[in-house]
Amino acid sequence: MDIFREIASSMKGENVFISPASISSVLTILYYGANGSTAEQLSKYVEKEENMDKVSAQNISFKSINKVYGRYSAVFKDSFLRKIGDKFQTVDFTDCRTIDAINKCVDIFTEGKINPLLDEPLSPDTCLLAISAVYFKAKWLTPFEKEFTSDYPFYVSPTEMVDVSMMSMYGKAFNHASVKESFGNFSIIELPYVGDTSMMVILPDKIDGLESIEQNLTDTNFKKWCNSLEATFIDVHIPKFKVTGSYNLVDTLVKSGLTEVFGSTGDYSNMCNSDVSVDAMIHKTYIDVNEEYTEAAAATCALVSDCASTITNEFCVDHPFIYVIRHVDGKILFVGRYCSPTTNC
């Protein structure tokens, strides 16, 4: 959750949507080639591949792919290549067709939702490109009926509102909790998908109360809040929305503690025989939430260069909120903030 917190704090008033699963996969690839303090800092983000496989096996709506492209003239260490396995492929980064092929691979895998991943030609110094893409599409276990969707005011702030297409569902049982914390009060609800995933929605009691909740959104707190959920008959109202995101994560990750991972401070002596540095980490995302299903995709790439009770209540999402798509085992696939309907894609 720390990466989400950093991005959210630097993009006040904007929608945010990221995939921790995709980001962790790329950081894991970098970890395989890292040494010393660089490896130590990356180790907290190492993705256990069996966890990704578990999600993929138990929920056919979620799939992930990792690819590592290495410059054909570079000499990579056998220990690094063994860890990467069949994900590795040598390419000519100076050939414009290489970028086209990589973008096409991500485009096809994400069902056309991430295109292009790479907007500009790569530097001639590019030694390695690590890519992770994830795609998620799942139907609601209890779909919203389209006849109940209508225009409804969404309060961007206490004094400003815009109309949104609000989906509604009445008198259904969902896991729900009202949480009181020193930093603010809020409600949390679990909206399950068919299969082993669900969307958790965190809604502050106050229209302008989201920032303090974001600042305290840690993995520990999130697990605690989820453990407080109880089955409740409740009316649910949540906007239909689409959001896209594009981020260079270097500054965010440095602020999150990865101070010796990027630029000249990174030690990747377990990757190849020459001195290399990680100069960029690009993350692109897409999500579509509607009455029938949620569809989401994300792709991340790192450029390595030479040097989600019985009394009927109401849960009305009519002001900024946080949403998390997670697997039943607790793994967070996507996390986002929705606060600006006018910037839907």
From Swiss-Prot:
Cited CDD domains: serpinN_SPI-1_SPI-2
Induction context: Expressed in the early phase of the viral replicative cycle.
Protein name: Serine proteinase inhibitor 2
UniProt gene name: OPG199
Domain of life: Viruses
Broad class of the protein's primary localization: host cell
Role summary: Viral serpin that inhibits both cysteine and serine proteinases involved in the regulation of host inflammatory and apoptosis processes. Major anti-apoptotic protein which inhibits both intrinsic and extrinsic pathways and strongly cleaves host CASP1 and CASP8 but is a rather poor inhibitor of host CASP3. Prevents the proteolytic activity of host interleukin-1-beta converting enzyme (ICE) and ICE-like enzymes. Can also block apoptosis through host tumor necrosis factor (TNF) receptor.
Keywords noted in UniProt: Early protein, Host cytoplasm, Host-virus interaction, Inhibition of host caspases by virus, Modulation of host cell apoptosis by virus, Protease inhibitor, Serine protease inhibitor
Subcellular location per the Swiss-Prot or TrEMBL entry: Host cytoplasm
SUPFAM superfamilies documented for this protein: Serpins
Pfam families linked to this entry: Serpin (PF00079)
Example GO BP: symbiont-mediated suppression of host apoptosis
UniProt GO MF annotations: serine-type endopeptidase inhibitor activity
